[in-house]
């Protein structure tokens, strides 16, 4: 009887089936692992691509910020009343600038001149378009002039016309183009490129009431990106001519 029971149990044993089920389960787990790995790989590839694009963009922006810049070549001032020995007050400034080697072109309409004098700070922007008309007649004038053909007087009053009053003069600067080999600068788009030379004209009489003898001035000519041009000078103790080199 016992032998018969053993034979029946052996005939209907589930060991083989258990092994089959175990094999199928292992296969399912393996397939799931492969799918998870594939999804993870896809996510990694996508993330790597995104990071690469961001790194490239950041690198380009950083390169632009590092290479772009303005340099101040010289600064001259005008004391228009030199006939009075005790006058000694600079009324107008001509800040000659160019852009640094390798710099991207810079739109001067987006540039700011910051100046500090006697503890007072001012921020000046391009005067741009000024409407000087009346109810019936309109004249549109830009604070933009060209002396590419040459000039013997950068302090010609016509160059300062748009900033001659206290309203514009205390808040804005004008542009005088000295060199523009590509003939690309315009009043609407005063974009300075390499080899261009420009004077930024400032009415310091309107901004600070003038700059007196022996006084220090500091500031910057700053574009939206890149290194600024540095303004740092002390006016001479005595003005012996109407035009004075300050920096």
Curated annotation (Swiss-Prot):
- List the Pfam families: Arch_flagellin (PF01917)
Query: Which cysteine pairs are covalently linked by disulfides here?
Result: none
| Gene Ontology cellular-component terms listed | archaeal-type flagellum
Does the keyword section mention Glycoprotein? yes
Q: Where in the cell does this protein reside?
A: Archaeal flagellum
* PTM text: Glycosylated.
Q: Name one GO molecular function term.
A: structural molecule activity
Q: InterPro entries given for it?
A: Flagellin/pilin_N_arc (IPR013373), Flagellin_arc (IPR002774)
Residue ranges annotated as propeptide in the record:
1-20
Instruction: Tell me if Glycoprotein is a UniProt keyword of this record.
Output: yes
Q: Cite any additional comment in the entry.
A: Flagellar filament preparations contain one major band with molecular weight of 41 kDa and several minor higher molecular weight bands; this is the protein sequence of the major band.
The function of this protein is: Flagellin is the subunit protein which polymerizes to form the filaments of archaeal flagella.
Name of protein: Flagellin B1
UniProt organism field: Thermoplasma volcanium (strain ATCC 51530 / DSM 4299 / JCM 9571 / NBRC 15438 / GSS1)
């Amino acid at each position: 009887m016992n032998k018969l029971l053993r034979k029946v149990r052996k005939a209907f044993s589930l060991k083989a089936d258990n092994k089959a089920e175990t094999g199928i389960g292992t296969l399912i787990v393996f397939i799931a692992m492969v799918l998870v790995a594939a999804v993870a790989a896809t996510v990694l590839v996508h993330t790597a691509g995104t990071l690469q694009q961001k790194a490239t963009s950041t690198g380009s922006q950083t390169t632009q910020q590092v290479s772009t810049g303005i340099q101040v070549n010289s600064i001259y001032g005008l004391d228009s009343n030199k006939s009075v020995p005790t006058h000694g007050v600079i009324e107008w400034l001509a800040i000659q600038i160019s852009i640094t080697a390798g710099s991207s072109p810079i739109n001067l309409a987006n540039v700011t001149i910051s100046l500090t004098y006697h503890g007072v700070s001012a921020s000046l922007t391009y005067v741009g378009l000024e409407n000087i008309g009346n109810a019936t007649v309109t004249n549109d004038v830009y604070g933009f002039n060209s002396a590419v053909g040459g000039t013997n007087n950068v302090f010609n009053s016509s160059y300062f016309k748009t900033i001659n009053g206290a309203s514009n003069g205390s808040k804005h600067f004008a542009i005088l183009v000295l060199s523009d080999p590509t003939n690309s600068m315009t009043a609407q788009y005063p974009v300075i490129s390499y080899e261009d030379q420009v004077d930024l004209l400032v009415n310091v009489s309107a901004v600070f009431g003038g700059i007196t003898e022996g006084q220090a001035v500091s500031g910057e000519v700053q574009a939206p990106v890149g290194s600024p041009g540095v303004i740092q000078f002390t006016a001479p103790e005595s003005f012996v001519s109407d035009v004075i080199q300050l920096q």
